[in-house]
């Protein structure tokens, strides 16, 4: 039970986002006693992934969170004369301007329920009503652990798939509503007809596109794993290197991004980026191929030839490209699809650096620089939580912390008081930014991220192979607006049901998410209508469902901006608007070195045969019964193994 928690730890981590989870894993691995809590009912915070009904429940939760604020003054009675309290926020204000639209046919029936649900899900066309019906089914389902990486086969030895999961209080066991592995729940094979569990990898084209209804989306809701934040992993990025170094990669599987796309003059086209792609491309003339290869070769070595770009350091990368004898076609590809930088704000050096990073990541695991975790980005925080739990970390979801207790004389935080009034002592405190109160953050200036999540019935660029994972950059059109990043996921990524695509749009906010992103949605997709459903000649993919929201970007905020934080309280930011995860890893390593300055950051775990258990250790051992994961019967055959074919980049 939560009220039986130990009262003394070395590190208390509040929030289960990616940076916090990495720090928790690193501290636990170095021998620290770690308590990891989250007031939410799911892992990941704003890095989480949800099934469709789980997402509707999340929307309802935010609606209720904005309407009702509960005050608990129990903690005030425990503050001594030589202490003062820093209250924490009980209201999450990181999500704003939520708008939901359903375009799919809403032929709902009373008996429509999510596949595998224990209770009927009476769907409705409004998100709030749908969430209410889905909540009972969603919260009754436990996400299973992620099994080790495999490639070429979806059969995994039983002993390999027994990965320890975070030890938790009973709140955790009935609360993990993120729906990561509910797609592969073993109950599906016994409770559902076999035709409801299609194979995940099927590249054969369907002769005729079937009409997709909202009822189908609800029923197949567990096939969806919808990320709140849309990012990819650079194959030579800091996160991939950390996953390999720490051996946390065995808890996850990945899929290559198969296409880099460009949107130019109203048309979506594929961008050749590797040497083989360039010379096999039919879009480029032979002269353009030579120009492009010459320029890309220079970009890889640009730091060795400073005289080539020194005169343009004060100009934008776009202006610099115009001086490099590149055709307008090539300039567009390099600027928007390879460097993925702004036409008006990115300087020459930043553009060259981004291009070099892109090119260096080519070929490590595929023909593009990027990987995507199967079942969504929300897997990544859970992988590191699993590592923390293996080394004794204790986990409690739905467990809020009321305040930090600060010693007036030393000005250091000495304890926290939780929702049950229990005082828990610790030496160090890691807290995610969203838990800080308005008083603590009164001087902080936050940016915002505009996000859209779409369910569509086809790809933005049709090819013979339907299982494509694509990234597309749409440049800004108006002064003051920002370019939009589009990531399109197929069903083999285990993020959507067969016959649909899950599309994420992201940009820095200038207005509300809908105002920022709707123009791009209208260019790429056609809203679903009954008439067009019968028309097989529709050029654009049809939009079935859309969600818009703004998310707070708390990255790159100086510690000095927070009011009166004790020196042993460390703040982690939420997701940023960048494509990769490097910021989260840098932040986690920096904070870890402040806590454990002489320790290695997330080293590989020792060989099990070399582990000697200390009977007097205060680290709690994870019970065997709590670490047996459910096996995943739907692992795609074409997943990628994170090995170490070459030395990780520095």
Curated annotation (Swiss-Prot):
Residues 156-208, 603-650 are annotated as: Disordered. Most abundant in the heart, brain, and spleen. Lower levels seen in the lung, liver, muscle and kidney. Extremely low levels seen in the testis. Coiled coil: none annotated. Residues 177-190 have a biased composition (Basic and acidic residues). It is found in: Cytoplasm, Cytosol. One of its GO terms (biological process) is small GTPase-mediated signal transduction. GO terms for cellular component: cytosol; nucleus; Rab-protein geranylgeranyltransferase complex. It holds the Pfam family GDI. Changing residue 279 to A: Abolishes association with RGGT. Its main location: cytoplasm. Residues 616-634 have a biased composition (Polar residues). Substrate-binding subunit of the Rab geranylgeranyltransferase (GGTase) complex. Binds unprenylated Rab proteins and presents the substrate peptide to the catalytic component B composed of RABGGTA and RABGGTB, and remains bound to it after the geranylgeranyl transfer reaction. The component A is thought to be regenerated by transferring its prenylated Rab back to the donor membrane. Belongs to the Rab GDI family. Monomer. Heterotrimer composed of RABGGTA, RABGGTB and CHM; within this trimer, RABGGTA and RABGGTB form the catalytic component B, while CHM (component A) mediates Rab protein binding. Can associate with the Rab GGTase dimer (RGGT or component B) prior to Rab protein binding; the association is stabilized by geranylgeranyl pyrophosphate (GGpp). The CHM:RGGT:Rab complex is destabilized by GGpp. Interacts with RAB1A, RAB1B, RAB7A and RAB27A and mediates their prenylation. Interacts with RAB5A. This is Rab proteins geranylgeranyltransferase component A 1. It comes from Rattus norvegicus (Rat). The gene is Chm.
């Amino acid at each position: 039970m939560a009220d039986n928690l130990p009262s003394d730890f070395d590190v208390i981590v509040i929030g289960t986002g990616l940076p916090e989870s990495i720090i928790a894993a690193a501290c636990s691995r170095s021998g620290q006693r770690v308590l990891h809590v989250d007031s939410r009912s799911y892992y990941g915070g704003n890095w989480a992934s949800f099934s469709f009904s789980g997402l509707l429940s999340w929307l309802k939760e935010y609606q209720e969170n904005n309407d009702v604020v509960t005050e608990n003054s129990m903690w005030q009675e425990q503050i001594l004369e030589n202490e003062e309290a820093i209250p924490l926020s009980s209201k999450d204000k990181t999500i704003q301007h939520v708008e939901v639209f359903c375009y799919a046919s809403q032929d709902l029936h009373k008996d429509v329920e999510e596949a595998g649900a224990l209770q009927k899900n009476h769907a409705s066309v409004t998100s709030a009503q749908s969430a209410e019906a889905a909540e009972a089914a969603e919260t009754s389902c436990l996400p299973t652990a992620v099994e080790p990486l495999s490639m070429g086969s979806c059969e995994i030895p039983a002993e390999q798939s027994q990965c320890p999961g975070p030890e938790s209080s009973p709140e955790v066991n009935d609360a993990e509503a993120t729906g990561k592995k509910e797609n592969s729940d073993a109950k599906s094979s016994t409770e559902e007809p076999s035709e409801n569990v299609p194979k995940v990898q099927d590249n054969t084209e369907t002769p005729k596109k079937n009409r997709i209804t909202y009822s189908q989306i609800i029923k197949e809701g567990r096939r969806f794993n919808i990320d709140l934040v849309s990012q990819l992993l650079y194959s030579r990025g800091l996160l991939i290197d950390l996953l390999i170094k720490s051996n946390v990669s065995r808890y996850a599987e990945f899929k290559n991004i198969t296409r880099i796309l460009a949107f130019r003059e109203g048309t979506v086209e594929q961008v050749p980026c590797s040497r083989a792609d360039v010379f096999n491309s039919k879009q480029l003339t032979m002269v353009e191929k030579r120009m492009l290869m010459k320029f890309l070769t220079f970009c890889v070595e640009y730091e060795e030839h400073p005289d080539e770009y020194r005169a343009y350091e004060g100009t934008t990368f776009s202006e610099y490209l115009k001086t490099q004898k590149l055709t307008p076609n090539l300039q567009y590809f390099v600027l928007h699809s390879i460097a993925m930088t702004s036409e008006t704000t990115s300087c020459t050096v930043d553009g060259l650096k981004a291009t070099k990073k892109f090119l260096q990541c080519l070929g490590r695991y595929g023909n593009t620089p990027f990987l995507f975790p199967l079942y969504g980005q929300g897997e990544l925080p859970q992988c590191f939580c699993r590592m923390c739990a293996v080394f004794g970390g204790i986990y409690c979801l739905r467990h809020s912390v009321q305040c930090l207790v600060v010693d007036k004389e030393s000005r250091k935080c000495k304890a926290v008081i939780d929702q049950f009034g229990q005082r828990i002592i610790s030496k160090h405190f890691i807290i995610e930014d969203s838990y800080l109160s308005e008083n603590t953050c009164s001087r902080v200036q936050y940016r915002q991220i505009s996000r859209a999540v779409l369910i569509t019935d086809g790809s933005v660029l049709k090819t013979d192979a339907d299982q494509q994972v694509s990234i597309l950059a749409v440049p800004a059109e108006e002064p003051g607006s920002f370019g939009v990043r589009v990531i399109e996921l197929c069903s083999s990524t285990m993020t959507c049901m067969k016959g649909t695509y899950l599309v994420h749009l992201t940009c820095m906010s200038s207005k509300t998410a809908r105002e920022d992103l709707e123009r791009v949605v209208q260019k790429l997709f056609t809203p679903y209508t009954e008439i067009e459903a019968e028309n097989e000649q529709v050029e654009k993919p049809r939009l079935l469902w859309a969600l818009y929201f703004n998310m707070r970007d708390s990255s790159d905020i100086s510690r000095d901006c927070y009011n009166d934080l004790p020196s042993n309280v460390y703040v982690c930011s939420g997701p940023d608007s960048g494509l990769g995860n490097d910021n989260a890893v840098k932040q986690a390593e920096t904070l870890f070195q402040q806590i454990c300055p002489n320790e290695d950051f997330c080293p590989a775990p020792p060989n099990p045969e070399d582990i000697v258990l200390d009977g007097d250790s205060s680290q709690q051992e994870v019970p065997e019964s709590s670490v047996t994961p459910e096996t995943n019967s739907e692992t795609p055959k074409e997943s990628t193994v994170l090995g170490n074919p070459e030395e990780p980049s520095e």
